[in-house]
C-alpha cells in the first residue's frame, strides 16, 4: 500500500556513493573479577539477594524490578568492573585496555592520512573530575600508547554550538584524531566523517 501512494528511491537507485561496512566483532574473555561477579549475578537473579552484589537488600519496589537491576549490573560489568564499584582495580585485559590498544593500532596505521576514529559508549560517559570510561581509555591512549592528549576529545566537552562546531571541524581537518560520545550526542547530525577510518562501539 505504501508504494502505491509514494514515490521513493533507495540510495542504490540514485547512485549515492556509500562506504561498505566491514563489521568486526571482538571476543574479549572475562577478567577474573568479571567471572566471579557473573556467578554472583546469576545467584542474585535466582534468589534476589542483593548483598551478593555488595549492595543493600532490595526494597519491595526493587524486588519487582529484580531482572532489570540484574541487566543493568550486567551491562556495567561487561564494560568495566569499576562501573559496578570503586573497589575494583584496572586490569590489562579489560575492555578499556583492549579498546585503547585497538584505537592505537588504527591511529598508527592511518597516521599519514590523519585518519580519525569515533568511539561510542552510552555508559561511562565523560564527567569532569570523576572516574569514567571515556577518560580511562584516553589515559591509556596517552600513557600506554603515546597519543597526544589534545588529539583525543569528548563530544560532551562542547557546551555550545560553536564549541561543537570546532570539534567537528577539528575531526575533519585531522587535528582531532579520536572523538568519544554517546549515541544521542554523536550519533546523528555530526558531519565529522571526512577522515573517518573506524567506528568503535563499546556497549
Regions found by a protein language model. Name each.
Residues 25, 116-118, 177-178:
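Residue-level preference for the first positions of well-ordered beta-strands
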Residues 88-100, 129-134:
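Phosphate/oxyanion-binding active-site loops and adjacent basic polyanion-contact surfaces
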Residues 1-89, 101, 105:
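Inter-lobe coupling linker of SF2 helicases/translocases
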Residues 148-183:
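Conserved helicase ATPase core of P-loop NTP-dependent helicases/translocases
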Residues 57-65, 112-135:
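Conserved strand-helix element at the start of the C-terminal RecA-like helicase core
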Residues 21-23, 147-150, 176, 194-199:
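Short glycine-/polar-rich loops that comprise or flank the Walker A/P-loop
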Amino acid at each position: 500500500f505504501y508504494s502505491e501512494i509514494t514515490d521513493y528511491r533507495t540510495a542504490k537507485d540514485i547512485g549515492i556513493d556509500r562506504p561498505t561496512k566491514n563489521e568486526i566483532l571482538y571476543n574479549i574473555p572475562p577478567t577474573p573479577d568479571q567471572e566471579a561477579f557473573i556467578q554472583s549475578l546469576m545467584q542474585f537473579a535466582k534468589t534476589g539477594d542483593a548483598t551478593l552484589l555488595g549492595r543493600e537488600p532490595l526494597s519491595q519496589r526493587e524486588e519487582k524490578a529484580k531482572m532489570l537491576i540484574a541487566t543493568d549490573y550486567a551491562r556495567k560489568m561487561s564494560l568495566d568492573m569499576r562501573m559496578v564499584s570503586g573497589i575494583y582495580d584496572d586490569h590489562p585485559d579489560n575492555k578499556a585496555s583492549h579498546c585503547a590498544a585497538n584505537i592505537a593500532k588504527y591511529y598508527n596505521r592511518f597516521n599519514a592520512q590523519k585518519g580519525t576514529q569515533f568511539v561510542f559508549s552510552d555508559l561511562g560517559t565523560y564527567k569532569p573530575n570523576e572516574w569514567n570510561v571515556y577518560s580511562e581509555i584516553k589515559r591509556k591512549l596517552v600513557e600506554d600508547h603515546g597519543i597526544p592528549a589534545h588529539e583525543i576529545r569528548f563530544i560532551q566537552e562542547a557546551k555550545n554550538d560553536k564549541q561543537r562546531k570546532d570539534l567537528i571541524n577539528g575531526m575533519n581537518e585531522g587535528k582531532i584524531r579520536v572523538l568519544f560520545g554517546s549515541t544521542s550526542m554523536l550519533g546523528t547530525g555530526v558531519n565529522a566523517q571526512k577522515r573517518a577510518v573506524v567506528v568503535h562501539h563499546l556497549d
